[in-house]
Amino acid sequence: MQEKGLAGKMMDIVPGLLVMVGTLYVLRTYVEPWMKDAVVFGRKGWLVQVLSLNYILLSILTGMFYRNILFGGKIPGWAEEGFRTTRLFIKTGVIMLGSLYTFDKLLKVGGVAITLIVAFVFGTAIFIMWLGSRLGADRSVTATMAAACGVCGVSAAVATAPGVRAKPVDLALSIATILGFGIMTMFVSPFIGKALQLSDYQFGAWVGTGILNSGQVLATCLAFNPVFAPGTAVAYGEIWNVVRVICIPFVVFFITAWYWKGEADAEHTSLGSILASKFPIFVLGFVGMTALSSLHMLGAEGSETLHLMRDVMAWIFGVGLVGLGAYIDVREIKAAGGVPLRIGLIAGMVKYILALIIILAFIPKEGAF
């Protein structure tokens, strides 16, 4: 079969991409405004204000509906290439989020973020190593679960798997477990945050620390407050998220070193090689956008340029989150069972609750910007 050229590959993307963009258009233009005006339990806008059913969560739910009901559990071939752009949309949105910050603002909250994230990332990994040994779990399973729960879910688990000889089934179980837990927290966290009257700063710090998957952190922050601007939940949550993502190569090295200690014939890799191969390149784009903002090259706060960028960000994230929902396979989550499920749920719940306690005890309501 003759390999397709660039034009052919681009055309393959169009059908699935049109589905995602069209879905978001309908949700933002018709469904969300209707829900804001709908009267439930005698209260106008109850669905949005109490359940946080804005276009962000609706995008994910619609994507899940496509995958698990409309498509019968598998994205069809005609739409597959379009839906594969999901990660590109989300990472592009993360890069654009850099426009919400300046370096002086990052320095004001960076110390708190680094302290909390490093403590939780490595603390979670160590806890899972201990829990896995107590429950008699395979070391490869324990290692991938430690990465998945400790850092940011799928990316960290995939990055760790080769160095700890994880089998495909080990990786699949780890990913399914943390995604399943993340889906639950993604929907309940906005409700908890509003019930506890958390500020955007507190909510962003909690979610950025306690939720396991990067995409779910963004979705949860936007469900709590869908506004893209400095001082909002997504602005604070993404600082925590970026710090956590930067930790990936260091955690991969830490976990693989633990694995080697118990496996005499395991393959040794240096920290330098792991840094070179695992460092998340999109973080550099985020930093670059922050540099442009710091130099006032994107315009002053409230400018037309920034207003346009934030509107574009909303669309980029919305399209990406429709795709994110379409990659949540309920059958795979149900298949995650036994010891891996117990490890993931215990560790995830401990991290989630402990993060909330620490945020309530030590993080003030007012952020640095």
Swiss-Prot record:
The keyword 4Fe-4S does not apply. Keywords: Cell membrane, Membrane, Transmembrane, Transmembrane helix. It is found in: Cell membrane. The chain crosses the membrane at residues 13-31, 46-65, 110-132, 142-164, 171-193, 240-262, 269-291, 306-328, 341-363. Its main location: membrane. GO terms for cellular component: plasma membrane. It is a multi-pass membrane protein. InterPro entries: UPF0324_pro (IPR018383). Coiled coil: none annotated. The keyword Nuclease does not apply. Belongs to the UPF0324 family. This is UPF0324 membrane protein DVU_0543.
